[in-house]
Structure formats: structure tokens, C-alpha cells
């Protein structure tokens, strides 16, 4: 396949590969949006695949569905997961994906820069807090700067329609984006999460940590008295 900078489906690699995982509520679908930075233009973001997980999945079944997608990419992606609606999901994700998981708490305010290292079972996870409007504005700025490339397909168009359909309200604190009643924004939010992660100054540190955890460990050598005789 010939490389085309405007078609992420032709990109041989992403630097790095990221899966943005929006965790839906009971009436919404959880999603996985896969992409990352271009191999030849670090500021160009490519969105290669957009997936809506089956409705009604929670906990381990939801993580298993995400793991199926992850295996299609050789289990080599950073997982950026929205933990806003279910903080306990962090434990399941950590058990399934290990140190590749970065948690995101989407709230009313926050710039998503200073993480909290939250204890999770016998380990810990970085959790970043970001305002919903701030997250969407970041993605909007990337779109306006022509720094995002979507794979062509119905799911990309659905994500665009979700973003385009958001209602805006101007308040003293800034613009508030809300989803109209009966509509969904899960794919659109996942795209914004992907863009946030791809532009984050901690990205290289996340990659280094994930790479170190996947590195095979040398077995510890033990020496008996026979080794010295």
C-alpha cells in the first residue's frame, strides 16, 4: 500500500499507537478509537479506526472486548481510558493491559497536565483530570489547524456528526458543550481523548514506562557451592 499522508489507513506505524477508550454509561456504548501521530509528521494526528463496543458490557467483559481490538494491533498501544463514570474499572484495566494504561477523569474543569498517582490493587495508575470543554476545545483547535486526518468510513462520519451536534452554552466560566437529549457523543469524545494524549508533554514518558514493563526480565542467577569448586 502506498503511503498517503492524508489517509491513516496507509500509515505503516504510528508514533506511538494509542487507543482512546471512552467508557459509556448504561444507555451508551463504550468506544475505542485507534490512531496516533504520523511517522513522518509528528504534529499530524491520524485516526485509523473507530469502534463502538457492544452495549451492556461492564467490568471484565468490557475490558475483554477492548483486548480483542488491542490484539489486532499486536498489544502495542497505549490505552487512554476515561474513568469518570466508573473509577473501579481502573483495576480491571490494569490487570488486563498493565502499565500501558493512562487514566483520564473528565470533569467540569482541569487542564489534564498534573497527574495523580492513584493506588490500584498492588500497583498504581496515573490519573489526569481534564475539563470536558477544555478537552473538546483542544481537539477543535487541532481540527482548525488541519492537523487531524480521519480514515474514510461511516464511523468517522458518525464521530464528526456527534461533535458537530454538540450544543454550546456561553457562561462566565467559558463555553460549555453538552450532548442533546437522546443523542450520543462517545465517539467524538474518544477522538478528543486521542488528540489530547498525542499532544501531551508526558507522552514519551508513558511510552518509556510501557516499554520497560514489556521488556523481558532476565532470570535471576543463583550460585551454589559447586560453582566455586
Predicted regions and their residues:
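RNase H-like, metal-dependent nuclease domains and their acidic two-metal-ion catalytic environment used
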Residues: 1-107, 114, 133, 137, ...
Amino acid at each position: 500500500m502506498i503511503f498517503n499522508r492524508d489517509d491513516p489507513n496507509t500509515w505503516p506505524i504510528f508514533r506511538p499507537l494509542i487507543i482512546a477508550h471512552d467508557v459509556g454509561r448504561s444507555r451508551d456504548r463504550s468506544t475505542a478509537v485507534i490512531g496516533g501521530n504520523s511517522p513522518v509528521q509528528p504534529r499530524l494526528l491520524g485516526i485509523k479506526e473507530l469502534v463502538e463496543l457492544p452495549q451492556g458490557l461492564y467490568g471484565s467483559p468490557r475490558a475483554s472486548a477492548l483486548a480483542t481490538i488491542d490484539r489486532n494491533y499486536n498489544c502495542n498501544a497505549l490505552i487512554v481510558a476515561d474513568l469518570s463514570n466508573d473509577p473501579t474499572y481502573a483495576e480491571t484495566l490494569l490487570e488486563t493491559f498493565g502499565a500501558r494504561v493512562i487514566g483520564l477523569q473528565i470533569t467540569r474543569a482541569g487542564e489534564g497536565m498534573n497527574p495523580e498517582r492513584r493506588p490500584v490493587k498492588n500497583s498504581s495508575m496515573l490519573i489526569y483530570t481534564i475539563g470536558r470543554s477544555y478537552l473538546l476545545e483542544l481537539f477543535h483547535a487541532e481540527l482548525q489547524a488541519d492537523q487531524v486526518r480521519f480514515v474514510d468510513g461511516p464511523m468517522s462520519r458518525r464521530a464528526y456528526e456527534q461533535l458537530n451536534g454538540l450544543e454550546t452554552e456561553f457562561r462566565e466560566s467559558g463555553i460549555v458543550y453538552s450532548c442533546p437529549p437522546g443523542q450520543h457523543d462517545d465517539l467524538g469524545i474518544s477522538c478528543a481523548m486521542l488528540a489530547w494524549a498525542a499532544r501531551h508533554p508526558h507522552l514519551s514518558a508513558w511510552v518509556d514506562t510501557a516499554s520497560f514493563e514489556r521488556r523481558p526480565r532476565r532470570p535471576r542467577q543463583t550460585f551454589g557451592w559447586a560453582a566455586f569448586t
